[in-house]
Amino acid sequence: MHFHERFDVIVVGGGHAGTEAALAAARMGSKTLLLTHNLDTLGQMSCNPAIGGIGKGHLVKEIDALGGAMAIATDYAGIQFRTLNSSKGPAVRATRAQADRALYRQKIQNILQNQPNLRIFQQAVDDLVVENDRVVGVITQMGLAFEAPAVVLTAGTFLSGKIHIGLENYSGGRAGDPPSIALAHRLRELPIRVGRLKTGTPPRIDANTIDFTQMTEQKGDTPLPVMSFMGDVSHHPKQISCWITHTNEKTHDIIRGGLDRSPMYSGVIEGIGPRYCPSIEDKIHRFSDKSSHQIFIEPEGLNTNEIYPNGISTSLPFDVQLNLVRSIQGMENAEIVRPGYAIEYDYFDPRDLKNSLETKTINGLFFAGQINGTTGYEEAGAQGLLAGMNAALQVQGKEAWCPRRDEAYIGVLVDDLSTLGTKEPYRMFTSRAEYRLLLREDNADLRLTAKGRELGLVDDARWASFSEKLESIELELQRLRSQWIHPNSPLVPVLNPHLNTPISREASFEELLRRPEMDYSKLMQIEGFGPGLADPLAAEQVQIQVKYSGYIQRQQEEINKAVRNENTGLPLNLDYKEVPGLSNEVIAKLNSHKPETIGQASRISGITPAAISILLVHLKKRGLLRKSA
């Protein structure tokens, strides 16, 4: 049975990747269908109730700069906002928000329901329709066929998902949801490498059974940050505190005593878990010298008693979970309302993807999110937006686009995945980016919004707001550069008390701001120098561009050198055995990875600069030198 309408893009899955993919394709004018097994769980925060953090917040800002929904939903759902690394340089500062699960889900669903060109339909997908190595549609569990020349798969942890609690296990996509078994079997028939990964979640605790007086209160920041460039503090709901407590030796003894019934340590779980978000049993095993581990007690919302104890993800048996929870200070009488569990699921080797996130073997089929081996809402959302956008571009007969590593953390994420692959759930950190001084949270819109507008991702309201901000920054920078103060100026006696060394020669306002003891708001408050910019985000941008101009210029010069060969394309059908001078190891790795560009090839482990030089000479001789899109 065929559905009565044909679509341009079909998105399978309604999590963070799927929602951003569907919204992106629809914003670009493509007739888009979002299929999900349950409309009520669209935008569900399946694990921790938080958005952002180190590296992750940078991705959220980039999604937002390209017109995505994640940051906007966070501003409407965030019940505590903090700027992490606030005392450090701007490159590593990151916004993190504790979110009300229900409010976040409601806002995402509201955005989806009001997006033109987007249809939503409740059905799980069991099969792909592939003809001559091109996807042409999908078939749902009730046999209903939907047709489209582009399909984006965002299946999360649902592909052959298996939930583990102690030595008991059962099939599931997440707690309370069925897995995607038929679709997983269908995907395993495709010529794409497949593996198993695992992730986990902690038990949820009844807040009424916690003694918060025995814990350390953690309040949000004042003034309140916002997540979206279109956001406003007035969008935030009521703000509340989180709390901090710790495990202890008794906790660790309880965990050690239960390891014989742990699915991880008894060989039941085969999948590899996230290195940077380990289970509590993994922490006790790997860091046996530590006598305690920090636990963040995080509310799941304003109208629920459920608490998320961040730091004790576990798949131990329920009786062990209860005992370990009750061994922690402040939780001696705690009651568990949902047990913690681990989930194992299929993922597909992202080296089998182009940097557009289209599979190399099936035209029109795109993967995004945990199916590519990543972990985290933010990583999923970023991939979803990129995959949905490129699916729409393909249908419209346009070239695919992916930002370079020096342009966005999204570019770092996709390049790492498609070039290096991953054997464990991949999460983003600022340390993964070579050019992080240029890839800051604060300038994500300056880096990406103009490109988003060109691609059709950015609407008129966002574009008007961005253009106004950009103009105000440029005018203020011009003012600071063009206005000067002389040693005999009447402003000097007013200014000197604020300086470490008095004015002895003429200086521009820009030079004054560059002094380490001066900041923009302080300078603008001095008579004769203001009033300056009222928009705090624009003012911050002016300060950073002035203070870090030398460092930024040097990093830009490094980028210009690196980019020369970065986008030199490599034919996907190139047999590296035919390239004289390459070692057998290099040939094997290049034939296995099939990099799309010289830049990707250079980042494969074991590919030497000499091998890259040989490749460039070969391409030039054969007339194959070309720039990738």
Curated annotation (Swiss-Prot):
List required co-factors. FAD
Gene field: mnmG
Q: What HAMAP family is this protein classified in?
A: MnmG_GidA
The residues the record assigns to binding FAD are 13-18, 125, 180, 370
Residue positions annotated to bind NAD(+) are 273-287
Q: What does this protein do?
A: NAD-binding protein involved in the addition of a carboxymethylaminomethyl (cmnm) group at the wobble position (U34) of certain tRNAs, forming tRNA-cmnm(5)s(2)U34.
Report keywords, A-Z.
Cytoplasm, FAD, Flavoprotein, NAD, tRNA processing
The main location class comes to cytoplasm
Which InterPro entries is this protein grouped with? FAD/NAD-bd_sf (IPR036188), GIDA_C_N (IPR049312), MnmG (IPR004416), MnmG-rel (IPR002218), MnmG-rel_CS (IPR020595), MnmG_C (IPR026904), MnmG_C_subdom (IPR047001), MnmG_C_subdom_sf (IPR044920)
> Could you tell me the Gene Ontology terms of the biological process aspect for this record?
tRNA methylation; tRNA wobble uridine modification
tRNA processing listed as a keyword: yes
Annotated SUPFAM superfamilies? FAD/NAD(P)-binding domain
The terms describing its cellular component in GO are: cytosol
- What molecular function terms (GO) are annotated for this protein? flavin adenine dinucleotide binding
Name the record gives this protein: tRNA uridine 5-carboxymethylaminomethyl modification enzyme MnmG
Subunit description: Homodimer. Heterotetramer of two MnmE and two MnmG subunits.
Similarity field: Belongs to the MnmG family.
Question: From which source organism is this entry?
Answer: Shewanella sp. (strain MR-4)
* Biological classification of the source: Bacteria, Pseudomonadati, Pseudomonadota, Gammaproteobacteria, Alteromonadales
The record, for Pfam families, names: GIDA, GIDA_C_1st, SAM_GIDA_C
